[in-house]
């Protein structure tokens, strides 16, 4: 019985770190904004009308893919990318610790002027 209890404790010590959330790596072209999802593909991005691209991906706080209809009407702080046609392509709903990372560009002009550290997932203003 003692060996079994020891084995369970050892196994639990390895399983605990696996349950921790992994830091997500956002691409350099990801911008930050507030999104309100209406009837897909229509959304409000930073208070302005926008559209989701065909095949767009929305990731929740657990990095799981979600469909826009499950998020209708909610307001979320997100990082997002835009395709060449100006449509919103990828959306990541931010966890509180990700939202606390500042500064993060909200416009393409800011992203071009600042420097991005992909390893640390931080932006550096000049």
Task: Label the predicted regions.
Residues 9-17:
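Hydrophobic core
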Residues 2-5, 17-44, 64-126:
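Short, flexible, surface-exposed loop segments at domain boundaries
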Residues 50-66:
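Beta-strand/loop nucleic-acid-binding surfaces
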């Amino acid at each position: 019985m003692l060996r079994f209890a020891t084995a369970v404790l050892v196994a639990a010590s390895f399983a605990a770190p696996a349950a921790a959330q992994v830091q997500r790596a956002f691409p350099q072209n990801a911008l930050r904004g507030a999104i309100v999802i209406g009837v897909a593909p229509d959304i409000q991005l930073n208070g302005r009308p926008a559209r989701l691209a065909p095949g767009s991906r929305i990731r929740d706080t657990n990095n799981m893919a979600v469909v826009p209809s499950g998020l209708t009407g909610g307001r979320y702080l997100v990082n997002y990318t835009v395709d060449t046609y100006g449509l919103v392509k990828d959306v990541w709903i931010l966890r509180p610790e990700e939202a606390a990372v500042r500064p993060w560009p909200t416009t393409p002009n800011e992203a071009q002027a600042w420097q991005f550290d992909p390893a640390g997932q931080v932006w550096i203003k000049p």
